[in-house]
Swiss-Prot record:
Cofactor: Mg(2+); Mn(2+)
Top EC category: oxidoreductase
Keywords: Isoprene biosynthesis, Manganese, Metal-binding, NADP, Oxidoreductase
Matches recorded under SUPFAM superfamilies: 1-deoxy-D-xylulose-5-phosphate reductoisomerase, C-terminal domain, Glyceraldehyde-3-phosphate dehydrogenase-like, C-terminal domain, NAD(P)-binding Rossmann-fold domains
Residues where Mn(2+) binds: 150, 152, 224
Role of this protein: Catalyzes the NADPH-dependent rearrangement and reduction of 1-deoxy-D-xylulose-5-phosphate (DXP) to 2-C-methyl-D-erythritol 4-phosphate (MEP).
Protein name as it appears in the record: 1-deoxy-D-xylulose 5-phosphate reductoisomerase
UniProt binding sites for 1-deoxy-D-xylulose 5-phosphate: 125, 151-152, 179, 202, 215, 220-221, 224
Record-level GO BP terms: isopentenyl diphosphate biosynthetic process, methylerythritol 4-phosphate pathway involved in terpenoid biosynthetic process
């Protein structure tokens, strides 16, 4: 019986994870569930899964959770705050951790799971984007197992030589596919008029609002490129992005002999989640088998960097190295939140990120303190740019 902590249980990845867990009560038991502010939903999940621990973002949220559960709180250790998150991730009674907290907030608890030698199902790409070599060094030092849950990285992992899930061994290049989001064919001159609801209406995937906006700008793919660089030790010049509107091929690995291996499937996060939970076995995930005859045509095109400047910025940050990816991620988080609050236009997201990258000093990412200092500096710089932009508009 595998005991699982779900970091970010109330998000879309949390939903999909718990759906797979529910299908296999003989294999999996929930040890801990965490959420930030969605206390109502967390209370409902606690009633169903009866975790040993539940963690929320604040003392107030913890009191609300206790009140909502009432007598049903018996046997559930309700805690709050960042330290409690790390304890849930590293607890000796937990075997595997689904790392699904969105953004920089997920780095410390994910690292705590790594340092405790857990099986880490990595859905929080920002952890690797920010800390890179520090993260992978911790994986090796503490003997953790990291299984990528992003559909692209999960596909790459499946297509690489087994027992050697890293670059080399005859691999020529790695191709990450991207749907192109909801604005792939929209006139570029109209993108400034895009609303948050339009940006969050992804054509293929059901996701949270932040990652949906990242998909619309293709920053999500840029972050995934950086993640792939660290996960698989791939030089930036061997990483390629290809737009594939149907989201059926989730990524590809090209080999020196001319072979190209691809992983296909319906666009449903339960597939990579089930793979990560059961690896190296396979289990039923509730996802229909792919019907290629019904799918028909599979199309591909190169990304237009004029339409998607955030993708180019991500490649620039990866090439710059050091703290540049952490700066990129922080500026993007601030910009996306400002867009969702209607403080800036959709097209200004890239402007905020580009200005922040250009104006923030980049140094070696040689410690977590350095990474978080760069993150904080970038957030201040991005907020300053947004405030100045709002005054001018």
């Amino acid at each position: 019986m595998m005991r699982i902590t779900v970091l970010g249980a109330t998000g879309s990845i949390g939903d999909s994870t718990l759906d797979v867990v529910r299908r296999h009560p003989d294999r999996y038991r929930v040890f801990a569930l965490t959420a930030n502010t969605q206390v109502d939903k967390l209370a409902a999940l606690c009633r169903v899964f009866r975790p040993a621990m539940a963690v929320v973002g604040s003392a107030t949220a913890a009191e609300v959770l206790r009140d909502q559960l009432g007598a049903e709180a018996t046997g559930i250790d309700i805690r709050f705050g960042p330290e409690a998150l790390e304890e849930a991730a590293a607890h000796p009674d937990c075997d595997a951790v689904m790392a699904a907290i969105v953004g920089a907030a997920g780095l410390r608890p994910t690292l705590a799971a790594v340092r405790a030698g857990k099986r880490v199902l990595l859905a929080n790409k920002e952890a690797l984007v920010m800390s890179g070599a520090l993260f992978m060094d911790a994986v090796r030092q503490h003997g953790a197992t990291v299984l990528p849950i992003d559909s692209e990285h999960n596909a790459i992992f499946q297509c690489l030589p087994q027992q050697r899930p890293s670059f080399g061994h005859g691999v020529a290049r790695i191709v990450l596919t991207a749907s192109g989001g909801p604005f792939r064919t929209r006139a570029v001159e109209t993108l400034a008029e895009v609303t948050p609801d339009q940006a969050c209406a992804h054509p293929n995937w059901v996701m949270g609002r932040k990652i949906s906006v990242d998909s619309a700008t293709m920053m999500n793919k840029g972050l995934e490129v950086i993640e792939a660089h660290w996960l698989f030790n791939v030089p930036v010049e061997r990483l390629e992005v290809l737009i594939h509107p149907q989201s059926v091929i989730h990524s590809m690995v090209a080999y020196d002999d001319g072979s190209v291996l691809a992983q296909l499937g319906n666009p449903d996060m339960r597939t990579p989640i089930a793979y990560g939970l059961a690896y190296p076995e396979r289990i039923e995930a509730g996802v229909p088998l792919l019907d290629l005859a019904a799918t028909g045509t599979l199309a591909f095109e190169a990304p237009d960097l004029h339409r998607f400047p955030c993708l180019a910025l991500a490649f620039d940050a990866l090439r710059a190295g050091g703290t540049a990816p952490a700066v990129l991620n922080a500026a993007n988080e601030v910009a996306v939140e400002a867009f969702l609050q209607r403080r800036i236009r959709f097209t200004e997201i890239a402007a905020v990120v580009g200005d922040t990258l250009a104006r923030t000093a980049i140094g070696p990412a040689d410690s977590l303190d350095t990474v978080f200092a760069a993150d904080a500096q970038a957030r201040r710089r991005a907020e300053h740019y947004i405030a100045a932009s709002c005054l001018q508009s």
